UniProtKB/Swiss-Prot annotation:
This is N-succinylglutamate 5-semialdehyde dehydrogenase. GO terms for biological process: arginine catabolic process to glutamate; arginine catabolic process to succinate. It is an enzyme of class 1 (oxidoreductase). Belongs to the aldehyde dehydrogenase family. AstD subfamily. It comes from Vibrio cholerae serotype O1 (strain ATCC 39315 / El Tor Inaba N16961). One of its GO terms (molecular function) is succinylglutamate-semialdehyde dehydrogenase activity. Catalyzes the NAD-dependent reduction of succinylglutamate semialdehyde into succinylglutamate. NAD(+) binds at residues 220-225. The active site is at 243, 278. The keyword Transmembrane helix does not apply. It comes from the Bacteria.
């Protein structure tokens, strides 16, 4: 059974859907996509359940979420193995993701109270009350790179606020979505409070176009997110929150400090998860001169020796395959395109078996108009620069704005960088691929429109209701002009 609708597991009636390991082609999961009628049934089930769920005390909603958290902890190894098999990420990495699913729940509960709870104050003889009310039925679209951690960063705040949910995982990771839905089922959520619909483009279109949803929380590619943005134009009654990618720059100062620490920071920023994190560094700005040369020599040498293997290999690999052979071919094509434009490969990516490729480092300094694209994989573009001001100007030359970083021991350089850079996540001497669940996640421009993750997700799962209240009506000593009683 493929879909969880109105408290029942049902088979899909749409096109066939399969999930294979990206490292061995082993069949992991198969089923049939949700048809438009089944998506509609899921939305209607969520609408019916909303009427009761929103009225339940917060403590009861919280108890269901905490029960889910305990189930995640008890099944964390199974979750980690499923994610590793579907995505190809090393097991050590997916174990971290499984732990983060439960860990983020505590943040979401605290955020509910601090950002969307209820406050009361007195002013001029009036009682001023701020309450928050759920939006209604929320559609949640999950990505493939963090198929457990990221969608639950939307699902949990939505449920805590009193919304009901229709969840569509990535078509690349349906098994992970099903495993997590089984845990929500075991947590005892009432029928229809959360629903699962599996499928690819047609299923997603049907869900996004449904008149029955009140909001949509999306994590994924800029291309899909921009289509959703156009689709939602003219519908101010629906909340749309988009988390998308970036063409993220990291500037290496001449004052970068320890060589090995800097190289390690770059590798962690560019090649972790095989470059399949939205915050990964895509453009590396390196100073002209001997210090920049030494850095690049060491970076290329270390990157060429990175261990690449399947998720369960011993010794453990740093990188696994990409999520699919199509994704791997896209990176190889991007490399060829950049070479054709005048880029010089310092380390050329090579196709291995299945969806494995080796990482690429390419000097694109000579390219006059560098394509402003997010290459979602292990491809790092290097640009040599003369001054920090020039590097920052080049770094800002993008329609995206998700993350950016500076590696420098000079406080003055950091002050200049943080004042002039345009990005939502800006790190100093730290990898770009780490983010705090307590902090806003997202960026301006083509990287998204809101910050609907973790602590700040609460803001987009409920609307504020402001009230001025009194026990009785009041008759003022002086009436408004033109009124006689």
């Amino acid at each position: 059974m493929t879909h969880w609708i109105a408290g029942e597991w049902v088979a899909g009636t749409g096109e066939k859907l399969e999930s294979h390991t990206p490292y061995s082609h082993e069949l992991l999961w198969q089923g049939y996509s949700a048809s438009g009628e089944q998506v509609d049934a899921a939305v209607k089930a969520a609408r019916r359940a909303f009427l009761d769920w929103k009225k339940r005390p917060f403590a009861e909603r919280e108890q269901k979420v905490l029960a889910f958290a305990e189930l995640v902890k008890a099944n964390s190894e199974q979750i980690a193995q499923v994610i590793a098999k579907e995505t190809g990420k090393p097991l050590w990495e997916t174990r971290t993701e499984a732990a983060s699913i439960a860990g983020k729940i505590a943040i979401s509960i605290r955020a509910y109270h601090e950002r969307t709870g209820e406050t009361v104050r007195e002013a001029a003889g009036n009682q001023l009350v701020l309450r928050h009310r759920p939006l209604g039925v929320m559609a949640v679209f999950g990505p493939y790179n963090f198929p457990g951690h990221l969608p639950n960063g939307h699902i949990v705040p939505a449920l805590l606020a009193g919304n009901t949910v229709v969840f569509k995982p990535s078509e690349q990771t349906p098994w992970t979505g099903e495993v997590l839905m089984q845990l929500w089922q075991q947590a005892g959520l009432p029928a229809g409070v959360i629903n699962l619909v599996q499928g690819s483009k047609e299923t997603g279109i049907a869900l996004a176009q449904s008149r029955g949803i009140d909001g949509l929380l999306f994590t994924g590619s800029a291309n899909t997110g921009h289509l959703l943005h156009r689709q939602f134009a003219g519908q101010p009654d629906k909340m749309l929150a988009l988390e998308m990618g970036g063409n993220n720059p990291m500037v290496i100062s001449e004052h970068y400090g320890d060589l090995d620490a800097t190289v390690y920071t770059i590798i962690q920023s560019a090649f972790i998860s095989s470059g399949q994190r939205c915050t990964c560094v895509r453009r590396l700005y390196v100073p002209q001169g001997t210090k920049g040369d030494a850095l690049l020599d060491k970076l290329v040498s270390v990157t060429a020796k990175l261990r690449i293997d399947q998720p369960f290999a011993e010794p453990a690999p740093f990188m696994g395959p990409l999520v699919s052979e199509a994704a791997a071919q896209a990176i190889l094509k991007a490399q060829a395109d950049l070479q054709a434009l005048g880029g010089k490969s310092l380390l050329e990516a090579r196709a291995l078996h299945a969806a494995f490729i080796t990482p690429a480092i390419i000097d694109v300094t000579a390219i006059e108009r560098l394509p402003d694209d997010e290459y979602f994989g292990p491809l790092l573009q290097v640009v040599r620069y003369q001054t920090l001001a020039q590097a920052v100007e080049l770094a800002n030359d993008t329609r995206f704005g998700l993350s950016a970083g500076l590696v420098s021991t000079d406080d003055g350089e950091w002050d200049y960088f943080v004042e002039h850079i345009r990005a939502g996540i800006v790190n100093r001497n730290r990898q770009l691929t780490g983010a705090s669940g307590d902090a806003p996640f997202g960026g301006p421009g083509a990287s998204g429109n809101l910050r609907p993750s973790a602590f700040y997700a609460a803001d987009y799962c409920a609307y504020p209701m402001a009230s001025m209240e009194g026990d009785t009506t009041l008759l003022p000593a002086t009436l408004s002009p033109g009124v006689e009683l």
